């Protein structure tokens, strides 16, 4: 039997501020409906999801404000860089997310965009609640203290 050529997961874009600005409750993987020029542009590695979010609309979940720049060789057949993109999820997942967003005041935040083993573009989506300023300060203090503990332990040896 022929062996499969296993490709590792390749991260394309990451939202580093999301874990600082939001308290993450749950994560899940979603596919994205893309055009051919968008996939080619993503393969060039220039896309960003730092200021993007997901929004439920008409029984579907849409990725808003994600920047996938135009593919240079596509000329007139190019896509719009910040167009809303449909996220591909199961109906049960969509209903769960829509309920959490509407009833509990939570937000859908993309954490990272990556190619899976099969070469498909996937989005790791988080169901999160926004942090207040004092919560962010607490997070920063804890992180600084853990760094300081590491330094002290290395110094003592």
Swiss-Prot record:
GO terms for cellular component: cytosol. One of its GO terms (biological process) is trans-translation. Residues 131-157 are annotated as: Disordered. Its main location: cytoplasm. The keyword Manganese does not apply. Keywords: Cytoplasm, RNA-binding. The keyword Ribosomal protein does not apply. InterPro entries: SmpB, SsrA-bd_prot, SsrA-bd_prot_CS. SUPFAM superfamilies: Small protein B (SmpB). NCBIfam families: PRK05422.1, smpB. Belongs to the SmpB family. This is SsrA-binding protein.
